[in-house]
């Protein structure tokens, strides 16, 4: 498959480029960056042996290169517009950018289906993180008192993380509604109890040195249960990205969540 990478200078995008280069059945045909200084990726020392054009305009890249799939790891500010542009050009998309609303996902799915092309948006591409979300979904049926703590590097722009939101969404499918905390609790400092989602609390930590971590803490009379996943390196996401790129060939719709393509 001929693959283009959008946001290739970001930490995740850089790792995606290296992954595409490693995979025998994937070919890196273009990279995209906002206002790039380079015209070819070989102007970067690490990739000096390659011959891959660098673009600053997504539509121009799609029309000139015509890739089979675009992997997008950019920012929440442009993630939706990028994905819409990719799909409208009839190109498959794998998107790790977060911050999509349910309405935006629905609209993008309609475009994918009208074009009969596959696309996948995932808050997290680590298989371990997907298992964490599935385990939490199952546990929530028996432990409705639950809070989420997600921890990421201090350059992450959105909070809470897409993984935390997706986890909460999945738990609402099995969890009996319970509003966390005392009915008359008072926050001495605003926000001390975290964000609220369907009665659950979500807490976001941003610190240097972290990559991506999350724990889901359940409490009940006389017992507790904690489910935690840690990504110590961005390589942890790459098997999921490569799987998703290949899977888009079999799809004619947009899938939200890596768990929906795992056997």
Curated annotation (Swiss-Prot):
It comes from the Bacteria. Gene3D superfamilies: Dihydrodipicolinate Reductase, domain 2, NAD(P)-binding Rossmann-like Domain. Its EC number is 1.17.1.8. GO terms for biological process: diaminopimelate biosynthetic process; lysine biosynthetic process via diaminopimelate. (S)-2,3,4,5-tetrahydrodipicolinate binds at residues 153, 162-163. It is found in: Cytoplasm. It holds the Pfam family DapB_C. InterPro entries: DapB_C (IPR022663), DapB_N (IPR000846), DapB_N_CS (IPR022664), DHDPR_bac (IPR023940), NAD(P)-bd_dom_sf (IPR036291). GO terms for molecular function: 4-hydroxy-tetrahydrodipicolinate reductase; NAD binding; NADP binding; oxidoreductase activity, acting on CH or CH2 groups, NAD or NADP as acceptor. Pathway: Amino-acid biosynthesis; L-lysine biosynthesis via DAP pathway; (S)-tetrahydrodipicolinate from L-aspartate: step 4/4. Keywords: Amino-acid biosynthesis, Cytoplasm, Diaminopimelate biosynthesis, Lysine biosynthesis, NAD, NADP, Oxidoreductase. Belongs to the DapB family. Catalyzes the conversion of 4-hydroxy-tetrahydrodipicolinate (HTPA) to tetrahydrodipicolinate. This is 4-hydroxy-tetrahydrodipicolinate reductase. It comes from Listeria monocytogenes serotype 4b (strain CLIP80459).
């Amino acid at each position: 498959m001929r693959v283009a990478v959008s946001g290739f200078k970001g930490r995740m995008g850089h790792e995606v480029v290296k992954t595409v280069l490693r995979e025998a059945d994937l070919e890196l045909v273009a990279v995209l960056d906002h206002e790039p200084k380079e015209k070819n990726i070989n102007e970067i020392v690490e990739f000096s042996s390659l011959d891959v054009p660098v673009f600053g305009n997504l539509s121009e890249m799609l029309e000139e290169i015509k890739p089979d799939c675009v992997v997008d790891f950019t920012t929440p500010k442009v993630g939706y517009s990028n994905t819409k542009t990719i799909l409208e050009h009839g190109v498959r998309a794998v998107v790790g950018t977060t911050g999509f609303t349910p309405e935006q996902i629905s609209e993008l799915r309609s475009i994918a289906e009208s074009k009969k092309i596959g696309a996948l948006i995932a808050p997290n591409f680590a298989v371990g993180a997907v298992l964490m979300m599935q385990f939490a979904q199952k546990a929530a049926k028996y432990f409705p008192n639950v809070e989420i703590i997600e921890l990421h590097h201090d350059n992450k722009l959105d909070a809470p993380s897409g993984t935390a939101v997706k986890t909460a969404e999945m738990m609402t499918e099995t969890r009996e509604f319970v509003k966390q905390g005392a009915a008359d609790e008072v926050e001495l400092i605003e926000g001390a109890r975290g964000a609220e989602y369907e009665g659950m609390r979500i807490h976001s930590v941003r610190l240097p040195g972290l990559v991506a971590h999350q724990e889901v803490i359940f409490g009940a009379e006389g017992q507790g249960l904690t489910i935690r996943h840690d990504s110590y390196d961005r390589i942890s996401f790459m098997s999921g990205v490569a799987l998703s790129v290949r899977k888009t060939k079999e799809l004619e719709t947009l899938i939200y969540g890596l768990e929906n393509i795992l056997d």
